[in-house]
Structures are given as structure tokens and as C-alpha cells.
Amino acid sequence: MSTRDTPYVAVIGASNATEWELETAARLGTLLAESGCVLVCGGLGGVMDAAARGCGEAGGISIGILPGDGRALASPHLTVAIATGFGEARNAIVARSADAVIAVGGEFGTLSEIALALKMGTPVVGLGTWELGRDDLDRDPIVRAETPEAALAELRRLVPTFGP
């Protein structure tokens, strides 16, 4: 499969994550690698590091889109670390680079990535993350999952290029 056909999935969440969020992100990284996906993340600690670690341990490829000018603070588990110098604006690159986004917990940076992805038409699956709603929406635009396995099942339903 060429990189044009390979699904890119962003795993997003906070750098100061809970133990559950870290375990969930690591499991997601493993499952994505085993499914042949490329993991995209913000490249730093917490959920980002845990997802990259799980991906790497399963032999997968992970790309970190870093906010700073250098790679010194990048997760050591990344396959590729890209220093943007864009600060939080790098969230747009994370959202744009992915065919789908999985949000695990998270704070305001995660919320911005969710909003950007949804605005771009990219599906978002959430595990213990923000709930969004407005009076004119009949449902939360984030597809909910309780486990990493359920999140991948939703990806298979939502993303045509996502394999079996």
C-alpha cells in the first residue's frame, strides 16, 4: 500500500493526562499500527507520547507535529518529528494531516484540534473527551466510543480508506 492509500489517524489529548488516558492512548497507538495506519500527533508528552509509544512497540509509524522550533522536546517514541515553530497553530496541521481524529480526554488545545477537524469535515471519535452542542444541533458531532477497540470500529465505519 502506498502512503497515498494509507490511513493517517491523529490521536490527540493533553500532555498532563490521567493514567486511564495514557493507557487508552497507548492501546490506540498499538491498534493503529497493527491496522497499518500512520499515527499523527502533537509530538510531545502525555497522550501524544503514549500513543507514539504504543505505535512504535507494535512496529508502526508515528509522526509528531511539534509546536516549537526544535525537536529536543519531542517524544522519544516518534518515528518522525517535525518542528514547525507555529506554536498552537500547529493544531491545524495535525487536524489537516489526518483522515480521522481520535480525541482522548484533553484540554483546550484538544478542543481546538477537535473544532478544526470538524470544520474541515474530518471525522472525530472521542473517548472521554469534550462534548459539543448547540441549540440548532440535534446531536454531538463527536462520535463516542468507550474503548480503543470501539474507536477503531467507528473508524472503519467512518473512513473509506480504513482497512478491515
What are these regions (language model features)?
Residues 23, 27-30, 45-120, 128-132, ...:
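Acidic/glycine-enriched connector segments
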Residues 38-45:
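A short beta-strand-loop structural module common to alpha/beta enzyme folds
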Residues 1-6, 162-164:
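Short, low-complexity, intrinsically disordered N-terminal peptides in bacterial proteins
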Residues 81-85, 125-127, 142-154:
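Short acidic-hydrophobic, aromatic-tinged amphipathic segments that line or gate anion-handling sites
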Residues 96-101, 145-164:
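A charged, well-structured terminal subsegment
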Residues 4-19, 29-35:
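Generic N-terminal amphipathic, Lys/Arg-enriched alpha-helix
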Residues 137-141:
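Acidic, glycine-centered active-site loop in nucleotide-sugar glycosyltransferases
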